[in-house]
UniProtKB/Swiss-Prot annotation:
Free-text comment about domains: The Q motif is unique to and characteristic of the DEAD box family of RNA helicases and controls ATP binding and hydrolysis.
Top EC class for this record: hydrolase
Upper lineage: Eukaryota, Fungi, Dikarya, Ascomycota, Pezizomycotina
Motif residue range(s): Q motif: 15-43
Record field: compositional bias (Low complexity): 622-631
Keywords of the record: ATP-binding, Coiled coil, Helicase, Hydrolase, Nucleotide-binding, Nucleus, Ribosome biogenesis, RNA-binding, rRNA processing
Protein name: ATP-dependent rRNA helicase SPB4
Superkingdom to which the source organism belongs: Eukaryota
Bias (Basic and acidic residues) ranges: 539-548, 566-581, 600-621
Species assigned in the record: Chaetomium globosum (strain ATCC 6205 / CBS 148.51 / DSM 1962 / NBRC 6347 / NRRL 1970)
Coiled-coil residue windows: 572-623
Boundaries of every Helicase ATP-binding domain copy: 46-247
Residue ranges constituting the Helicase C-terminal domain according to the UniProt record: 284-434
Amino acid sequence: MPPEQVRARKTPRSWGALTPSLAPWILDYLSSMGFEQPTPVQKSCFDIFRGNKDVVVEAVTGSGKTLAFLIPVVERLLRSEDPAKRHHVQAIIISPTRELASQIYNVLVSFLKFHAPSAHLLPHAKGDEKRPATTEPVVVPQLLVGGTTKAAEDLSTFLRLSPNILIGTPGRLAELLSTPYVKAPSSSFEVLVMDEADRLLDLGFSQELTRILGYLPKQRRTGLFSASLSEAVERLITVGLLYPHKITVRVKSLRDGGIVQERKTPMSLQMSYIVTPASQKIPALCQLLERLEPRPSRSIVFFSTCFAVKYFARVLHGILPPGFSIVSLHGKLEPQVREKNFERFVNAASPTVLLTTDIAARGLDIPQVDLVVQHDPPTDTKVFIHRCGRAGRAGRRGLAVVMLQPGREEGYVQLLDVRQTPISPLAKPPVSVTAADADLASSRIRAQARADRDIYQLAQRAFVSWARSYIEHQATSIFRVADLDWADLAQGYGLLELPKMPEVRGLDRSLGLAIDTESIPFRDGAREKKRLAELEQWKKEKAAREAQRASGGGGDATDPLKRKKNEAWSGKHEHEDVKAARREKKRRKREAQRLGDMTEPEREEQRKLDEMIAEVRRRNAEAPTPAAQAAGSGGGGGDEFEGFDD
């Protein structure tokens, strides 16, 4: 071992100074990752969680919480005297999103590559053969997230791989634990970790968390990690943890006058704002990317809705400075596409911009994010911190900028200051957008919309979804719909016309452009051919209705609404039959889902009950009615069971 390495490990704040000391292979991993010393949350957590104590950790975003629980969990599993029994789970890590669960899993896999016995088993995770048995303790992880694999496939992998640590989202974890093949007795199970606990509850996973806790022994170690402790999280702590030690890691900074103020973000992160009209936001983004020194390798731009992300991902390719690639990530993407896009962004070799919603605002530890831009301020001010925290992680310098429209929105700065999240006007790099810059950007976007009807329609949907999101903003005194400049907003989106919305009633929907939007074609030839055929059919039906009205016929025969009212009873009965068939299909689907959620013993008991009820009903149907009995026996009554009432 080189002398320099020994001296580095003995530095008071280094990893080697921790007591009890970390295993050499763990130190090798930390050194290879460039982590010279533990962060405050890691040091505080190691002192307690490595012992036999539950912990509740509240720490700012980007403070290194992932390693704060992964290292103690792995150490605990490897301290076992004997290898885990087959199909016995020793640890579970719960994450609110697929992306975060996948990231934790990947960090753990890279970590275990430095532990030779565990690294030897990692290739079996992707094979079809059972992993070999071991005579020494190892860590074998399995990732459980919905969308990418089916529950049956996860169970098959579990039976083949026999992992002792599960990492996943609440729904899929609860589903796997409900099977009789997965065992977590008190003799085997060691530790439970709930990461981003506040987010778990915000997303409505309380029922799944209750189910998971019910499957696990009460005698266990539990770690709860969160950026904030709400009342709901406090209730979860009461139910799921036993005499926990609370660890709160704060960041403090000096304000004017030497006043010490707590911060909820790392000191390495600069948080700023710019005041700009909506029409100038995209040009301002371009200037930030172009003028920031050094040039940002990875940037994240947050929008308020999925449709906005989808739209701007289509139109910004010709707007952003040369050399920047665009990747989109939002909740309406298929899980496989989301995972692929996330990997593209993380592994990008050239400057890349991620356009996303709040799906990427929590927990994701994306390396080397230099710039975060909030095109739309979040509807929940708590999310603001988490968005900013994607940059400036683990001591790396980062810049986070939020764009505010002139007027009442500038009050957002004071609101954040009250909530211990001070932001300052952006001074560097300088951003100075002119009206000509805004006109040029909108004209380029509009040219794309005029060339492809798909972009035109997507722009309309994106704008409507943004308006709905703005209306639902929690800070209604600051974000007021009545104060919006709709024409300027439309220019920022590059709209060819305002969509039909109650909020823009009475305004010139054409925006003074006088564009015949009906003539805009689809770039896809097949879609355009279908559109033209439907348009021609609509024109014929319209002409027929007008001709019938002119002749005094009233147009009932061709008007779809009136035709429905005057429909023959036979036709209505046919519709009722179709509806009844659909209801029956839905009932069977619900029943199948209910049976699928049962354990094997529960399904066996349900089958026996169904058979008994069917037999009783069959006998009841074959038995004579009371009237027939009376006629046949002269009114003599019997005590024969006549079945259940339906």
